[in-house]
Amino acid sequence: MGVMKRYMQFVKPYKKQIFVTVLIGIVKFSIPLALPLLLKYVVDDIIQGGGTASDKTTSLFTIMAIMFALFLILRPPVEYYRQYFAQWTASKVLYDIRAKLFDHIQKLSLRFYANTRTGEVISRVINDVEQTKDFVITGLMNIWLDMLTILIVISIMLTLDVKLTLISIVLFPLYGISVKYFYGRLRKLTRERSQALAQVQGHLHERIQGMPVIRSFAIEDHEQAQFNEKNGHFLDKAIRHTNWNAKTFAVVNTITDLAPLIVIACAGYFVINGPLTVGTMVAFVGYIDRMYNPVRRLINSSTTLTQSIASMDRVFEFIDEPYELTDKPNAIKADQIRGGVEFQNVSFQYEKDKENILHDVSLKVNRGETVALVGMSGGGKSTLVSLIPRFYDVTSGRLLIDGTDIRDYEARSLRNQVGMVLQDTFLFSETIRENIAIGKPDATLEEIIEAAKAANAHEFIMSFPEGYETRVGERGVKLSGGQKQRISIARVFLKNPPLLILDEATSALDLESEHYIQEAMDKLAKDRTTFVVAHRLSTITHADKIVVMENGTIIEIGTHDELMDYESQYKHLFTIQNLN
């Protein structure tokens, strides 16, 4: 019941629309309830009543004309508005939930995404949220209408014959027993099926992104076997769910089909041996159908609601994923950052109870300085710079910006003061203009063009027929590595932050692209505090400080000339690269 109560918080803003939908539904379901009474009247009062054949025919066509008019005038608009309001309300609720989830997604730590498959996150936001739609339409609307229909039908039947009415509802307790027995396990099976589907989606999403690797290594058969294993696991869970669901329907529908047989037998006996009229018997059989159809729908609704609640469990399990990084209640805005950065005895680990990646790192960087971080792969360079925009909090020690611990700043305002150009540039499948504007969403086209020119990107952008409106494809697949990198640099020019991080931004590029990008980065770094993670040491000889890292610690600090004056690790690396 806890998840249903939480779900109702999303439904609450639309309670008026739900109330109107239920009222319209009452009218919709009430209209057909007149048909058995009409049938009784036709049988008892017209067909078996007194009068000539002509009088009976006139009475029959008169009453039928009235009923035709009633159905033609009322039924279409009632049916339309009930369906429209029900679907509109459910869609709005799902819109709000997905908006909440996306807001939540943007606040989760990078550690969460490192440990969670993208496809599984997508499954929660799309599939599981969609499954909860039935709770709104079925649980909050149809169930009440079906229950009200049953009560109205029983009330009408009681006016016709009390004894036969009691016989009609004698099987009701069996429904309650069936629901209690079947639906507890059904919720568990539904949850397992949803989890298996999320695994398939996660696997599929990853393989689609890695299709060039699959093709280049010719491992299609291996990957097909891997997918078949995941898909087979989902199939197994789906069949187990279907098997249990089928048992539920078998029992429920058998009970539903027995009820009319019992009523027909008893009603026939009462007509033969008692005062019950043929018309009343016919009406009763008609009402049995109108009573047990809602009962059947209620049981089916239990299945639907069980599946919806299982999906709610997964949705709220995701919403309850804690934030690793939260702002202090009195956090200050980082609007006036000057650019001084200091690491004070900083240690860091990605996972608790795991070995530290950084060990007691201390480093002071003055405003406007360019600091290069060099060393062998795995030394902790990228980890160190990832602490500056507070993607992670330090495990111990302090990281200060302008003398203030970064945990005292609002994280979002702090990140707004940091520009990053990474080796693996991510572009969205939108236009070049929109991708550059990520640096400043409200930027004018003129500002975007100026940023592109500064990044040496304007010329190649204008070589495309659609210029800045060229769509770059998923992850920028239509652009070369150098072109994507220049778009990334243009973003930072547009953002114009006081702090800059360049993480291996020129690695794996051809010489021409590297020349354009290095020139753009030199312009970008001017008058900014800049951290450069580099493997090509020839690109950072101008740095104010060169920091050599090894196994998560700083082993050397100095300028290029200072470090080349003795047998330093830096000199060793620089000499090897120049020899190559």
Swiss-Prot record:
GO terms for cellular component: plasma membrane. PROSITE patterns: ABC_TM1F, ABC_TRANSPORTER_1, ABC_TRANSPORTER_2. Its main location: membrane. The keyword ATP-binding applies. InterPro entries: AAA+_ATPase, ABC1_TM_dom, ABC1_TM_sf, ABC_transporter-like_ATP-bd, ABC_transporter-like_CS, P-loop_NTPase, Type_1_exporter. Signal peptide: none annotated. Keywords: ATP-binding, Cell membrane, Membrane, Nucleotide-binding, Translocase, Transmembrane, Transmembrane helix, Transport. Residues 341-576 form the ABC transporter domain. It is found in: Cell membrane. Pfam families: ABC_membrane, ABC_tran. It is a multi-pass membrane protein. The keyword tRNA processing does not apply. Residues 19-307 form the ABC transmembrane type-1 domain. The chain crosses the membrane at residues 18-38, 58-78, 136-156, 164-184, 244-263, 269-288. GO terms for biological process: transmembrane transport. ATP binds at residues 375-382. GO terms for molecular function: ABC-type transporter activity; ATP binding; ATP hydrolysis activity; ATPase-coupled transmembrane transporter activity. Its EC number is 7.6.2.-. The ATP-binding domain (NBD) and the transmembrane domain (TMD) are fused. Belongs to the ABC transporter superfamily. May be involved in multidrug export. Transmembrane domains (TMD) form a pore in the cell membrane and the ATP-binding domain (NBD) is responsible for energy generation. This is Putative multidrug export ATP-binding/permease protein YgaD. The gene is ygaD.
